[in-house]
């Protein structure tokens, strides 16, 4: 992108605003190097990064990038074998700690936020945990080495503290004792790295020791008392040892960094990129900017676009279309009406979008991808235009025409101004034709009425104007697309008090064509305002309808949620009641069995089985409940005496003998006659003869559809095996089997013993015993029924 357009449209001020948002040296470099991009993929990637930054800012307060200095010079010094100082090491330590923090930050968010680019950028980071911990442990943020940097450093510092404590103790005798009256001030100070006291010159003889300094007047001598000379010597030795150990540690840490300088430098660059993304997101928030769509066809539509450098409380937003049906737009209207600002808004927002920045416009705005943006915009708000001004503009236009391509955007402000109106209008039309022949996109502002007709008659060209309020005599700064500007000179003059005679005389001097053109424009403005009013009314009605729809949707969702909750609550309550009934029923069955054992013959076994099976059906079968259509269809089937039916509760096929009532039938199941609920039966074959014509035939269990004659309990838990055994024996009895085989395996013997105990208690079992060796041996039990 040419440098002139960046200067003309004040692109540098956008960069300055971004610089106020970055906190790292590498981030500042990226902002300063920022340029509009011309590759659609690169533009979309840059916008994706800004969108990620905006999401992170909104949800997490931004990517955690702290202030970071430029560490490149320090890394270069390491590469040549130099020893870094504490501040340089602290700066590198902050970079390494930030790498770890951001890596963890993004890893923790991977299941929460679907970033478009940040996770890819995260992969460019190289986490160096051991080196980071080493630097963090050894170096404070201000560059001071910590006591944990080495045991030797910790030891020598403890020694220094001990000696200093002894020195202060002895010095206290001078500052607080009887000799304090000989001091200029009762304090301890340092001269030449040694502790001294300020002694009045006339009392020098009262103190032994060494004089290290004197005051400017000579009235105070700074004396090191003899009693602490040895301590000061020891202190000095310890301090020199500390310095030596610090230098050794700095060299050691610098050597440890040497193998990783390339990775650390790359990390710093990636952190700068994260900082740059943060800055773009913060600027977007400050400007209330949105992400623009990218049109590969250069179909530009800026919705309520605002110039980012104008006070947001004063700026007027405009819809600016270009490139769909029209490649050229001619904007007419009065001076100070906002034409130039409209041009600059279009150009600057286009540059911002191509730089990966959000733009101050409404959602769903679109930008194009132009390889160049050219502009001829000068300070032509003054009417004093001369030949030199015209020449300067024409020189710029010639330069633009030489570089045009079909992917260029050209902005002309007051095209053809500064010369004779007729010649200027002709030149303006010819220049617009030349731009159109290349296929470039152009927006031009002008005063010339001839260009209004040009915009009306030329293909892919549309007129536009800046609205002017004739009542207030003030521009509204609103762009009216499709409506050419009209002169308001007569209206303004009349409202300002110019005699009507003069106004009418002036009107008579212009051609009838001009009158008709102005009248046509006036009618267009009225129609536009009427359409705009109707549109606003429709928009409000649509918004109201949407609001009602949203409320109804929310209410319906709440209703269904509460309904489902109540249904589930009722089902749970019903199942709870059934559980209680089941418990009571089991107790009753147990009592019945005891009665049967005590008084044989009083209770029939099939009654016990029927009662127990019916109780098992008390719980709601949720899949069956949900399949209500099938259940209703089954209930609609007419049943007749003699029909063959499948009884779901027994998993047996039987024959209908007699209907007790609407809900119950007597069914022949093998050797047993059972009372069965209607809704547990499914007709499998219609009757072919009436009950009177069709005799009831007893069918042995062996010929009926029923359970297998073998039950395999191997691999089951004890409780489950016993439950399966109980259910199987009931089914076998109903099927009329004379004998069955129970396979329990050997294992620990628990299930085998359980089977034996169960069969021993069951009064329907005649005999039982292990199978022959060739049929399973002690791993299976053969049961014979009565």
UniProtKB/Swiss-Prot annotation:
Coiled-coil ranges per UniProt: none
Record GO biological process: mismatch repair; negative regulation of DNA recombination; rescue of stalled ribosome
Binding site for ATP: 333-340
Annotated EC: 3.1.-.-, 3.6.4.-
Region (Disordered): 682-709
PROSITE patterns hit by this protein: DNA_MISMATCH_REPAIR_2, SMR
GO molecular function: ATP binding; ATP hydrolysis activity; ATP-dependent DNA damage sensor activity; endonuclease activity; mismatched DNA binding; ribosomal large subunit binding; rRNA binding
Enzyme class: hydrolase
Keyword line: ATP-binding, DNA-binding, Endonuclease, Hydrolase, Nuclease, Nucleotide-binding, RNA-binding, rRNA-binding
Subunit comment: Homodimer. Binds to stalled ribosomes, contacting rRNA.
Stated name of the protein: Endonuclease MutS2
Organism: Lacticaseibacillus casei (strain BL23) (Lactobacillus casei)
Chain's gene name: mutS2
């Amino acid at each position: 992108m040419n440098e002139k357009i960046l200067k003309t449209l004040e692109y540098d001020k956008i960069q300055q605003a971004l610089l106020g948002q970055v906190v790292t040296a590498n981030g500042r470099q990226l902002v300063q190097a920022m340029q509009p991009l011309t590759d659609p993929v690169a533009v979309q990637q840059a916008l994706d990064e800004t969108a990620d930054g905006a999401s992170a800012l909104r949800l997490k307060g931004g990517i955690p990038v702290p202030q970071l200095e430029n560490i490149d010079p320090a890394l270069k010094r390491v590469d040549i074998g130099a020893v870094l100082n504490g501040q340089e090491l602290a700066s590198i330590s902050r970079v390494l700690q930030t790498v770890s923090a951001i890596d963890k930050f993004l890893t923790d968010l991977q299941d929460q936020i679907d970033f478009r680019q940040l996770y890819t950028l995260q992969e460019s980071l190289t986490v160096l945990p051991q080196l980071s911990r080493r630097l963090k442990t050894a170096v404070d943020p201000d560059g001071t080495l910590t006591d944990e940097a080495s045991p030797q450093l910790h030891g020598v510092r403890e020694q220094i503290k001990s000696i200093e404590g002894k020195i202060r103790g002895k010095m206290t005798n001078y500052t607080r004792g009887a000799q304090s009256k000989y001091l200029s001030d009762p304090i301890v100070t340092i001269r030449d790295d040694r502790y001294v006291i300020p002694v009045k010159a006339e009392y020098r003889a009262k103190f032994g020791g060494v004089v290290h300094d004197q005051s400017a007047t000579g009235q105070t001598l700074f004396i090191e008392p003899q009693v602490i000379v040895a301590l000061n010597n020891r202190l000095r030795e310890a301090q020199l040892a500390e310095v030596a150990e610090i230098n050794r540690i700095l060299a050691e840490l610098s050597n440890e960094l040497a193998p990783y300088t390339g990775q650390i430098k790359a990390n710093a660059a990636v952190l700068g990129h994260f900082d740059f993304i943060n800055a773009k997101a913060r600027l977007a928030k400050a400007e209330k900017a949105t992400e623009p769509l990218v049109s590969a066809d250069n179909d530009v539509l800026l919705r309520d676009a605002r110039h980012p450098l104008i006070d947001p409380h004063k700026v007027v937003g405009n819809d600016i279309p270009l490139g769909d049906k029209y490649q050229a737009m001619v904007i007419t209207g009065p001076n100070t009406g906002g034409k130039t600002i409209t041009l600059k808004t279009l150009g600057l927002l286009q540059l911002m979008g191509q730089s990966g920045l959000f733009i101050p416009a409404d959602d769903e705005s679109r930008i194009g991808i132009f390889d160049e943006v050219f502009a001829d915009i000068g300070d032509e708000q003054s009417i004093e235009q001369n030949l030199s001004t015209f020449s300067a503009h024409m020189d710029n236009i010639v330069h633009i025409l030489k570089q045009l391509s079909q992917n260029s955007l050209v902005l002309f402000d007051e095209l053809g101004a500064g010369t004779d109106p007729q010649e200027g209008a002709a030149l303006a039309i010819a220049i617009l034709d030349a731009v159109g022949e290349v296929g470039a996109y152009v927006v031009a502002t002008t005063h010339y009425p001839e260009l209004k007709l040009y915009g009306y008659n030329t293909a892919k060209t549309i007129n536009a104007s800046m609205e002017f309020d004739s009542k207030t005599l003030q521009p509204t700064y609103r762009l009216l697309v499709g409506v050419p500007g009209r002169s308001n000179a007569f209206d303004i003059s009349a409202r300002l008090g110019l005699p009507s005679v003069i106004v009418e005389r002036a009107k008579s001097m212009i051609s009838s064509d001009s009158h008709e053109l102005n009248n046509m424009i006036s009618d267009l403005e009225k129609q536009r305002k009427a359409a705009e009013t109707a549109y606003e009314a429709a928009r409000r009605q649509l918004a109201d309808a949407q609001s009602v729809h949203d409320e109804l949707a929310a209410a319906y969702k709440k209703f269904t949620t509460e309904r489902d909750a109540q249904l589930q609550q009722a089902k749970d309550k019903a199942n709870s009641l059934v559980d209680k009934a089941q418990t009571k029923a089991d107790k009753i069955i147990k009592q019945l069995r005891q009665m049967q054992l005590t008084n044989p013959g009083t209770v029939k076994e099939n009654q016990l089985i029927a009662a127990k099976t019916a109780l098992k059906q008390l719980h709601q079968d949720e899949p069956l409940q949900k399949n209500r259509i099938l259940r209703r269809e089954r209930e609609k089937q007419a049943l007749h005496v003699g029909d063959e039916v499948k009884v779901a509760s027994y998993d047996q096929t039987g024959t209908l003998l007699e209907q007790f009532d609407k809900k119950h039938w007597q069914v022949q199941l093998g050797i047993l006659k059972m009372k069965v609920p209607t809704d547990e039966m499914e007709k499998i074959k219609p009757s072919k003869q009436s009950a009177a014509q069709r005799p009831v035939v007893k069918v042995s269990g062996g010929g009926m559809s029923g359970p297998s004659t073998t039950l395999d309990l191997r691999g089951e838990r004890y409780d489950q095996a016993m439950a399966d055994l109980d259910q199987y024996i009931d089914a076998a009895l109903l099927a009329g089997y004379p004998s069955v085989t129970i396979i329990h395996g050997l294992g620990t013997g628990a299930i085998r013993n359980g089977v034996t105990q169960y069969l021993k208690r069951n009064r329907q079992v005649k005999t039982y015993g292990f199978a022959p060796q060739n049929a399973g041996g002690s791993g299976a039990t053969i049961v014979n029924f009565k």
